[in-house]
Regions:
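Early extracytoplasmic/domain-onset interaction patches
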Residues: 10-54, 134, 205-271
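Beta-strand elements of well-folded, non-transmembrane domains
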Residues: 28-32, 38-46, 55, 106-108, ...
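A surface-exposed beta-strand-loop module
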Residues: 60-65, 69-137, 172-206, 281-282, ...
Length: 415
């Protein structure tokens, strides 16, 4: 019986997750507390619960959980590690931790996602404290294991120190925030210093961002001020490229994209010049619902009186994916798959695989075809081997610009 139980436990799927993002709002320093908005996606197919560990040394209060798709509250309870282990997914739950056990709005679909937002307040006097050397200063010293984070200072505080390269972003109410992506392994050893020297209220509110472009870039190419000061870490579109045989010039890809704009009812992807597209498909990650996808030209869009949101040439192909209109306070996350053929971007040259492409999104990944080994990558990337032996490169770009990625690979020696 014991052997059978251990075998069943070993066969049970483990809790898996993706797309973690955390926003910390520092409350008044006298409270030693901060409010956390934790966005996380459950990815274990069939899962009906998600378990969020309560960090050791922190006291949690004011918890709430929401379904990101509908915006509706979700039921939850705080359980011990021993209680969490009753769920086969959590066989490795720690006795030293409590967990927030969330009941998901719907079972996670096969190859789908269950997106949730966990809100809680932590009190941790070791992480958030007054600066002993500065009577007006505060310190937020907290190693962060989540790779995408934002920390918002209390009203009236200016940022005086930040040891992790970060964006600095004024909030609409005048508070100052830092935002960063940590692409490496391990925790980001974040230490923030701030001082109560900034105004509050209307005097602190920033001017509205404009559409003006930088004088440094060509007038029609440079990003707008609004784009340059948008938060990179919270941008939710990530793309994975799967390179096929380089002689084919073809690569498939999928990109995940969340739409929360009320009334939005379609996605338009304008195909880059020099590329052709085929086999588009899409589905709703939240539910597994399949969506219709088609390729139309700019002329066909104009004839159908469809506005894709940007200027499109008459012969330019556009991938069009309609979906039910998004209601206010809700969102939908899509996975869109396509295959591109782009001889200028992907080719075999002098016996080498060459992939040369500009990436504008913060998170991009490239998977080499089977049988090839990596020799060059012009842009720093994390590299890992997939279970099937293919090599994956992950590019995280926390700057508000494109990265021009050049990858080269060679064939492996036959076994």
């Amino acid at each position: 019986m014991l052997a059978a139980g251990l075998a069943a436990q070993a066969a049970a799927p483990r809790q898996t997750e993706a797309d973690a993002y955390t926003r910390y709002e520092l409350l008044g320093p006298e409270t030693a507390s901060f409010k956390i908005y934790y966005e996380i996606t459950a990815t274990t197919a069939g899962a009906t619960h998600y378990y969020n560990p309560i960090r050791a040394g922190s006291t949690a209060s004011d918890e709430a959980v929401y379904d990101a798709m509908s915006g509706k509250p979700l039921p939850f309870e705080v359980v011990t590690g021993a209680a969490a282990r009753q769920d086969p997914m959590m066989a490795r739950a720690s006795d030293s931790m409590d967990y927030i056990k969330v009941t998901l709005a719907r079972p996670v679909p096969e190859e789908g996602q269950g997106r949730i937002i966990i809100v809680k307040t932590y009190k941790d006097e070791k992480s958030y404290l007054r600066d002993p050397r500065d009577p007006k200063g505060i310190i937020f010293n907290r190693p962060l294991g989540i790779q995408r984070n934002e920390v918002v200072l209390p009203p009236g505080y200016e940022l005086t120190g930040c040891n992790v390269p970060s964006q600095v972003l004024a909030q609409p109410d005048g508070r100052v925030a830092i935002s960063f992506m940590h692409a490496g392994s391990g925790e980001a050893p974040l230490i923030l210093h701030a001082r109560a020297d900034a105004p509050t209220g209307d005097a602190a509110r920033p001017a509205a961002l404009t559409g003006e472009r930088s004088w440094e870039a060509p007038a029609r190419q440079g990003p707008t001020e609004r784009a340059r000061l948008s938060e990179r870490a919270h941008q939710d579109r990530d793309i994975v490229y799967f390179l096929e045989a380089p002689e084919s010039h073809a690569f498939s890809l999928y990109h995940d994209y969340t739409e929360a704009q009320p009334g939005a009812h379609a996605y338009y992807n304008v195909v880059r010049e020099g590329s052709t597209v085929s086999s588009p498909s899409a589905y709703v990650l939240d539910t597994g619902e399949k969506l219709n996808a088609q390729v139309m030209t700019g002329a066909q869009l104009a004839a159908a009186k469809i506005n894709p949101g940007e200027s499109v040439g008459a012969s330019t192909p556009v991938v069009v994916i309609p979906f039910p209109p998004v209601a206010k306070g809700t969102s939908v996350r899509l996975r869109i798959s396509e295959t591109y053929t782009a001889p200028a971007s992907y080719r075999l040259e002098n016996g080498e695989l060459v992939f040369d492409r500009s990436f504008g999104r913060p998170r991009n990944a490239v998977v080499l075809p089977a049988g090839w080994y990596l020799t060059d990558s012009s842009i720093p990337a994390t590299v890992r081997e997939l279970p099937d032996g293919r090599i994956r490169l992950d590019f995280w770009n926390d700057r508000p610009d494109n990265i021009d990625v050049l990858i080269k690979a060679r064939r492996k020696q036959p076994n």
